Structure formats: C-alpha cells, structure tokens
Amino acid sequence: GGDTYTLVSKMKDVGIDSLRDLIIGYALMYYNTPYLWGGRSPYGIDCSGLSQIVYRMAGIDLPRDASQQVTLGQNYSFLEEAMPGDLAFFGDETGAITHVGIIWEQNRIIHASGRVRVDKIDHQGIFNEDLKRYTHNLKVIKRILND
C-alpha cells in the first residue's frame, strides 16, 4: 500500500590504510583493461583516467589529465618514501608530465600502457618486463592521501 520507509544510516569512517587498500583494489579491478586515449571505463582507459576513476571510487576527486593531477598533493623525491595509493608521475626530456601510475608497493606500479598492467618501478622509472626496457622516466611521487 501506501507505506513509506526511511533508512537512516551513518557513513563508516574508513582509516587511511583501508583507503589505500581500497584504491589498490579498485585499480586492480581494471587489470588488463585495454588502453584507450581519453577512456575511463572497463572497455578502455588511459593512465590519468585510471587514477581519476580509482580515486573517485574512493571518494576523492582528481582532475582529468596527468599534467593537472601532478599539481596536487605532497612531493616525495624517493621511491622508498612512497606508500600504496601514492601517484607516480613520469615525463619526457623537456620535463613535461606525460604519464601517471598508482604505486602498489615500493617496487610495483599499476598503470595503463597498452593495457592496465603491473610493472616494476625504481628510481629511474617503469621497467616493462615484456619489453625488457624502461618505458617511462620517473619525475615525482605525490601523496594525495593525508596520513
């Protein structure tokens, strides 16, 4: 009939470690998604679309492009300081930011290059195991999540 119901609920406060785990989990949901410039869906996604959509799923808004995303957060110069969920930015020889990925572990990164993949990362950049070479030069690590 004519009954109405109201659900009253409070948002659960998620700790920072749980938020980092959420971001990694969301990013891995896109694993093997094909690369598509300008894409932001499981049918095709680009590097900055991946970071933007994953952070949005965790309740944090990021700008669309890597060159805009790099303006946010706190700088970290050393990979050893990085934590899961931090963003690593990569650039060309002119210094322009051309790529972004999500740090998973100190030596692993989730990013979209050909497809969403997990590669090794070190102080030089991303090492693609399939190609046996560096594909992206590391410029800066940014922490968007406040500890």
PLM features: what roles do these ranges have?
Residues 3, 10-13, 40, 76, ...:
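Aromatic- and glycine-rich peptidoglycan recognition patches
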Residues 56-57, 81-84, 133, 143:
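C-terminal amphipathic alpha-helical segment
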Residues 34-42:
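Short helix-to-loop capping/linker segments positioned immediately adjacent to catalytic or ligand/cofactor-binding
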Residues 1-33:
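Boundary regions of SH3-family modules and the immediately adjacent low-complexity/disordered segments
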Residues 62-119, 124:
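...with weaker cross-activation on analogous glycine-rich loops/strands in unrelated enzymes
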Residues 27, 41-58:
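Active-site nucleophilic cysteine motif
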Residues 31-35, 58, 62:
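Sec/Tat-exported extracytoplasmic proteins
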